[in-house]
From Swiss-Prot:
Compartments, as annotated in UniProt: Cell membrane
One Pfam family it belongs to: Asp-Al_Ex
Organism: Cronobacter sakazakii (strain ATCC BAA-894) (Enterobacter sakazakii)
Protein name per its UniProtKB record: Putative transport protein ESA_02488
Similarity comment: family membership: Belongs to the AAE transporter (TC 2.A.81) family. YbjL subfamily.
One GO MF term attached to the UniProt entry: monoatomic cation transmembrane transporter activity
Protein keywords: Cell membrane, Membrane, Repeat, Transmembrane, Transmembrane helix, Transport
An annotated GO BP: potassium ion transport
Membrane topology: Multi-pass membrane protein
InterPro entries, per the entry: AAE_transporter (IPR050144), RCK_C (IPR006037), RCK_C_sf (IPR036721), Transp_YbjL_put (IPR023017), YidE_YbjL (IPR006512)
């Protein structure tokens, strides 16, 4: 039996789509030196090559892909978006505005100088910034800009072409910029990170290991009684001195949980909870020959929970003010916008931050009620909320404003982005509403993006040969300028206007570019995870601004 593969793919859009995705994902795993091509560029290259052979796909699949992607971007940004906008993140907001705004203006200037149309200019901006949200926003706005027929098809093809030609140059140039810009500016990021660490009492280790606390029991002897010198537990400050706290005391056969007024007596058996290294550092008066093994005394259920910050009396306070250790709890991680932060007592808590806390189950539950709520450990997605807000986003996108002879539509990209932000924000405030497991959210977001990239490449592939010959050199030059010049402008603004610490500044700059590979290089250069503080500060707001930049460049382009 003979099978004509070309006819088979042309006759089955679903099969063609998944063939493109599979081949593209394989290609995306290849590396050029230390740089991995990535899924987006892999799928785009394969789809462009097949598009040259006149394979095509239903545009409805492309539209659904970009809608799912941009909605999930909003859901991710939602928990921290408003806190960055309205609280002490004004520096990060200003940095993101400078980065995105300068890139937009430079792209507009270069596009006009080279005589390109809006498709090439917007595509070049998206590729140079390695930002799919720009591509999505521009594509959606083009479809609602009044263009029709061949003019719209050409603009969309040029949009894909500009993105494909400049994406890799944007990624590689930013990675090299992240590696060498600190050296060219004579900035020692390691010293800057250590300075912040000293000021805030931070652990600068980017690869900090997290251990669970353990419980061990000891009998109080004369040395320990002499060490206590009649002071109660509050006066002794056991945790400050040892890193452990007393969870239980057995006295005269009676087991009890002590309060701060308890005084240690000869013969008491005490259960100490702390990290393994804290037990190892205990004074010999605790340990030598006095450890006991009592099932009832050691019977404590230590749990680790992720607590979402919600309560108004906690939001806006500093992490150190929670005094978790005074409540018998241990802080393992602080996560903001899916980014692990260094544990810093001076971090101002935002609504939606996640604190990973260990301790006795009752104590963790008590502290969770005071801070917010324990994140639901469920694999079930609230599909009703997902679909309802998706519908709301589409309806918002239908809104059109009329100004005399000029009309402006919000568009699906902005509408879905706003609806996603609201769903993410409400989820951070109501633990039982709109729950989407992080793995499910990432899968839908990535799948939507890959479907969109496949559709973009297949639709543009037939014209890539001609386009590459006509504007290839100009496009690569423009991509390099738009990728690096806004980074330099952002650095000068942050260093000399905002006077930010350099480690935080470089992290914030990579967050404004939403580029995780470059962020890893900055952390490696600083030998610290301190830059993650800056990265998290700009990342969420930059995703939103980049989508709006894609919409704005089409709106303000003459003739659209």
């Amino acid at each position: 039996m003979n099978i004509n593969v070309a006819d088979l793919l042309n006759g089955n859009y679903i099969l063609l789509l998944f063939v493109v995705l599979a081949l593209g994902l394989c290609l995306g795993k290849l590396r050029l030196g230390s740089v991995q091509l990535g899924n987006s560029i892999g799928v785009l290259v394969v789809s462009l090559l097949l598009g040259q052979q006149h394979f095509s796909i239903n545009t409805d699949a492309l539209n659904l892909g970009f809608m799912l992607f941009i909605f999930c971007v909003g859901v991710e940004a939602g928990p921290n978006f408003f806190s960055i906008f309205f609280r002490d993140g004004k520096n990060y907001l200003m940095l993101a505005l400078v980065m995105v705004g300068s890139a937009l203006l430079i792209a507009l200037g270069l596009g006009r100088a080279f005589g390109w149309d809006i498709g090439l200019t917007a595509g070049m901006l998206a590729g140079s910034m390695t930002s799919t949200p720009v591509l999505v926003g521009a594509g959606d706005t083009l479809r609602h800009a009044g263009m029709e027929g061949a003019q719209l098809a050409q603009a969309l093809d040029h949009l894909s072409l500009g993105y494909a030609l400049t994406y890799l140059i944007g990624l590689v140039s930013l990675i090299f910029g992240a590696r060498y810009l600190p050296k060219l500016q004579h900035q020692d990021l390691q010293t800057s990170a250590q300075q912040i660490a000293r000021e805030r009492g931070l652990d600068t280790d980017a690869n900090r290991k997290v251990y669970l606390p353990v419980i061990r029991a000891y009998r109080v002897g004369p040395e320990l009684v002499a060490w206590a010198d009649g002071k109660n537990l509050r006066e002794l400050g056991i945790y400050r001195q040892t890193g452990c706290y007393i969870e239980r005391i057995r006295r005269n056969g009676i087991l009890a949980s002590p309060d701060g007024d308890a005084v240690l007596q000869m013969g008491d058996e005490i259960a100490l909870v702390g990290y393994p290294d804290a037990h190892a550092r205990l004074d010999p008066s605790f340990r030598n020959g006095k450890e006991v093994f009592d099932r009832d005394l050691l019977d404590m259920r230590i749990v680790t929970e992720e607590i979402v910050v919600k309560n108004h009396n906690v939001v806006g306070r500093r992490l150190g003010q929670l005094k978790l250790t005074d409540h018998g709890c241990f802080l393992n991680r602080v996560i903001r916008s899916q980014i692990e932060m260094p544990i810093d007592d001076n971090i101002v808590l935002n609504k939606g931050d996640v604190l990973q806390v260990s301790g006795d189950a009752r104590r963790v539950k008590t502290i969770a009620d005071r801070i917010g709520f324990i994140s639901i450990h469920s694999q079930v997605t609230d599909l009703l909320a997902f679909c309802a807000f998706f519908i709301v986003g589409l309806m918002i996108g239908m809104i059109t404003f009329q100004f005399s002879s000029f009309s402006f539509g919000i568009g699906n990209a902005a509408g879905l982005l706003f609806a996603g932000i609201m769903l993410g924000f409400l989820r951070a405030n109501h633990p039982t509403f709109g729950y989407i497991p992080q793995g499910a959210l990432m899968m839908v977001k990535e799948f939507g993006l890959m479907v969109f990239m496949a559709g973009v490449g297949l639709s543009a592939g037939s014209g890539i040969g001609h386009g590459l010959g006509a504007v290839g050199g100009q496009m690569l030059f423009a991509g390099l300028i738009v990728s690096l010049l806004p980074v330099v402008i952002c650095f000068l603004f942050g260093a000399y206007v905002l006077r930010m610490n350099r480690a935080l500044l470089f992290g914030a700059m990579m967050g404004a570019r939403t580029c995780a590979p470059a962020m890893e290089i900055i952390s490696d250069t600083a030998r610290s995870n301190i830059p993650a503080l800056g990265y998290a500060g700009t990342y969420a707001i930059a995703n939103v601004l980049l989508t709006l930049a894609g919409t704005l460049i089409v709106i303000i382009w003459p003739g659209t």
